Amino acid sequence: MEMLQGLLLWLLLSVAGVWASRGPLRPLCRPINATLAAENEACPVCITFTTSICAGYCPSMVRVLPAALPPVPQPVCTYRELSFASIRLPGCPPGVDPTVSFPVALSCHCGPCRLSSSDCGGPRAQPLACDRPLLPGLLFL
């Protein structure tokens, strides 16, 4: 009887896990539009712009039982293909490069976080925090 209960519990948890991973609360890794901010200490304003970034859910595993094995690497939603675009900050003094370049996500995938090209730190409390006055809204896709 205990074996049957254990099997039933395993089956229910398996089905629930599959159902939860496909639900609307966890959109899978994909390009989305996001508004970011750019500034330069030598220029008088901060400017916001809209671009595409990679965001969404990546399936992952965590070891439940302690083991002598190293932890399982956790995949993150990151760029598969990208291009770069640039904006010019207005009002920069002569001799200061007003150009700010940024990545534009063309496609995304779940994979290891590469610190050389990605910020792997998770969500920010203030993603649009600027030290300079804010000049709103450019759209670059």
Curated annotation (Swiss-Prot):
Keywords of this entry: Disulfide bond, Glycoprotein, Hormone, Secreted, Signal
Intrachain S-S bonds: C29-C77, C43-C92, C46-C130, C54-C108, C58-C110, C113-C120
Give the principal location in a single coarse category. Answer: secreted
Signal peptide as annotated in the record: 1-20
Modified residue annotations for Blocked amino end (Ser): S21
Record: glycosylation sites: N33
An annotated GO cellular component of this protein is: cytoplasm
One Pfam family named in its UniProt record: Cys_knot
Molecular function (GO) terms for this protein are: hormone activity
**Subcellular location(s) of the protein:** Secreted
- Gene Ontology terms: biological process: G protein-coupled receptor signaling pathway
Q: Which Gene3D superfamilies match?
A: Cystine-knot cytokines
Q: Which family does it belong to?
A: Belongs to the glycoprotein hormones subunit beta family.
Record note on quaternary structure: Heterodimer of a common alpha chain and a unique beta chain which confers biological specificity to thyrotropin, lutropin, follitropin and gonadotropin.
The entry's function note states: Promotes spermatogenesis and ovulation by stimulating the testes and ovaries to synthesize steroids.
What is the recorded name of this protein?
Lutropin subunit beta
Q: Which organism is it from?
A: Sus scrofa
